[in-house]
Amino acid sequence: MASGGESKNDDLSTAILKQKNRPNRLIVDESINEDNSVVSLSQAKMDELQLFRGDTVLLKGKKRRETVCIVLSDDTCSDEKVRMNRVVRNNLRVRLGDVISIQPCPDVKYGKRIHVLPIDDTVEGITGNLFEVYLKPYFLEAYRPIRKGDIFLVRGGMRAVEFKVVETDPSPYCIVAPDTVIHCEGEPIKREDEEESLNEVGYDDIGGVRKQLAQIKEMVELPLRHPALFKAIGVKPPRGILLYGPPGTGKTLIARAVANETGAFFFLINGPEIMSKLAGESESNLRKAFEEAEKNAPAIIFIDELDAIAPKREKTHGEVERRIVSQLLTLMDGLKQRAHVIVMAATNRPNSIDPALRRFGRFDREVDIGIPDATGRLEILQIHTKNMKLADDVDLEQVANETHGHVGADLAALCSEAALQAIRKKMDLIDLEDETIDAEVMNSLAVTMDDFRWALSQSNPSALRETVVEVPNITWEDIGGLDDVKRELQELVQYPVEHPDKFLKFGMTPSKGVLFYGPPGCGKTLLAKAIANECQANFISIKGPELLTMWFGESEANVREIFDKARQAAPCVLFFDELDSIAKARGGNVGDGGGAADRVINQILTEMDGMSSKKNVFIIGATNRPDIIDPAILRPGRLDQLIYIPLPDEKSRIAILKANLRKSPISKDVDLDFLAKMTNGFSGADLTEICQRACKLAIRESIENEIRRERERQTNPSAMEVEEDDPVPEIRKDHFEEAMRFARRSVSDNDIRKYEMFAQTLQQSRGFGSFRFPSSNQGGSGPSQGSSGGGGGNVFNEDNDDDLYG
């Protein structure tokens, strides 16, 4: 029942986006005949709309564009489609599959005169009379309807020329009859100016903010188009919208699109531009902007970067800012009821804006334009790639799923990076010096999935630009042993990201934190790196001591900032290395920077509790001094899973040696199992060191051999023909034996005993090893026994503890 209610509310909140079905709304289809002023409908649809063959119709497309055409019937056209060629589609700013509306336009007059101009790059090098060759045959006996602002293409004399209708009399549309005067004198129109108007932003150029767009539409379009609605209900239409969100999510873009689509007068104020050095001038600039807008109502005033001109008045020391804020307040209250002026503002720091501006009646609607989710990212990618040539193997959905935390701007950068990579591959065929590029090369360009993969490896979400994170290329294979721990970690991070529905089903929020502890050199940091790489989440690594700075209160601010960034780029793994440096037990250290360390811990504790459950942020801590860590941070709900990472046992040691020597050539007689048996009590780092040293010895021998051979060659040139094989093809047994002479244990038995004791006490104080429910019947107790026993063994490797002493 509840879910039904929610979905109903969703429908209402986006109700304004739904297309109403009317008989005159048709879907654009490719035309068969190439005539620029003909659209064709099915006969049934023409009867329904009461149109006749040869009638003039008015077509309305996107971005308030309209044009006039002649309608003909076409039997092959289905009822809900309309056929038009590319020229008409461009004039309406629509693509195939978009929806346009069509209505009869009976009162089109014959034109007295029209003025058309060619577009410069299509008439280069044409000699002769444009009018005679192109325009006269095009308009002769055709009675074409045209509209001011249309562009049409005329073929003739071996090439095609594009013309733009600059003026018609009577305006805005007329039919070109035999006695209409056609002017085509004047400077040709530059293609750039045309392209700019073509590239205006519309609603369909914005992806990933469907709900917010609906809110904005009902705030802007309803009052501007149908003010009577609000009068009938008896409320004042809302007047201010504040868009806020992280940079790059499309706040300014939305405002532009609204301006283009509503056709209202649009007045852009860039925040800092208003400021002036003369006293009183800044305020008068603001007043002028509002007066201008009221004259041209309905109008939209858009203030970009609002936090520059309306900061909190208590915080600013400048007199000017205060006066500007006051002026803005009075102006927004003084907008007359009748004047349909809407004020929109954008900022990415909504909390630094004066609170008086955020009350109802000024900026009464605050629309949070957040970081898009996977479906939103897919929409954005489709918009950015709709003009790109994509190869067949490109799977945009997968790209959308992998780009966690990317905003629209990052995705745009990603697409252009992929396209550049595609061009680089063809670089050997392109010569920069040439005037033109081969058509073959141009046509063979296409962006493949590999290009996207490459771009993905290059791109970081902009929320994480400062804490730039190299995602390490370490996989689970690089880590020998520790299988239980690996599984725990995968469950911790991957389940909430990949199966959120399961958590909903069982009604629990996933746990958010893990603490690794154990002797140094056992792979705690390595595990965190591997998890960052394996589960497509973003990864922020925080080295403990970095957080502390000399300024009072700055260390805590650093903590806050890091958690904010992680929330913005969710799903995200926060890895605190050397946690003991920032989370010491409180109260012991007196006089350390005025107790700065204590305050940092308090900040971390509050942040960990305040992780809103919606965001997937995981915290992993690693330390080798678990005894001095503040107990408050170890409670369930913060770092709730304490995982002891012991020294590797024999099985794990074999796995570690194999993982280390995966890429090395080793001779057959090296018995790694025996090596593992002998190196009891060695940590993972010690084993790695043995492998490195053996490798180094082999390299040394190889180099010495080469030098010796070079000498022999110089003394005895006749022996050169004999091609000898590589003297040291692989790491031999004696290299390992030599390396073992230098091997040492980095962790003494004493240390290990400490860790063991700690793990033991934790387990006793925390867990009930022998807990059973009282059995009502024998069948019920069986499975629960087994599972609880297994669980205990998993977390603290009880079975492996004995091997540590050997």
UniProtKB/Swiss-Prot annotation:
Gly residues bias locations: 779-794
Q: Which reaction does it catalyse?
A: ATP + H2O = ADP + phosphate + H(+)
Per the record, the GO terms for biological process are: autophagosome maturation; autophagy; cardiac muscle cell development; chordate embryonic development; DNA damage response; DNA repair; double-strand break repair; endosome to lysosome transport via multivesicular body sorting pathway
Any one GO CC term of the record: VCP-NPL4-UFD1 AAA ATPase complex
Q: What is the effect of changing residue 805 to A?
A: Inhibits cell-proliferation and enhances apoptosis at low temperatures
- What Enzyme Commission number does this protein have? 3.6.4.6
Tell me what turns on expression of this protein: By cold.
Record-listed ATP 1 binding positions = 247-253, 348, 384
Which Pfam families is this protein grouped with?
AAA, AAA_lid_3, CDC48_2, CDC48_N, Vps4_C
The UniProt entry lists the main location of this chain as cytoplasm
Report keywords, A-Z: ATP-binding, Autophagy, Cell cycle, Cytoplasm, DNA damage, DNA repair, Endoplasmic reticulum, Hydrolase, Lipid-binding, Nucleotide-binding, Nucleus, Phosphoprotein, Transport
Assigned protein family: Belongs to the AAA ATPase family.
Q: What does this protein do?
A: Necessary for the fragmentation of Golgi stacks during mitosis and for their reassembly after mitosis. Involved in the formation of the nuclear envelope, and of the transitional endoplasmic reticulum (tER). The transfer of membranes from the endoplasmic reticulum to the Golgi apparatus occurs via 50-70 nm transition vesicles which derive from part-rough, part-smooth transitional elements of the endoplasmic reticulum (tER). Vesicle budding from the tER is an ATP-dependent process.
Name of the protein in its database record: Transitional endoplasmic reticulum ATPase
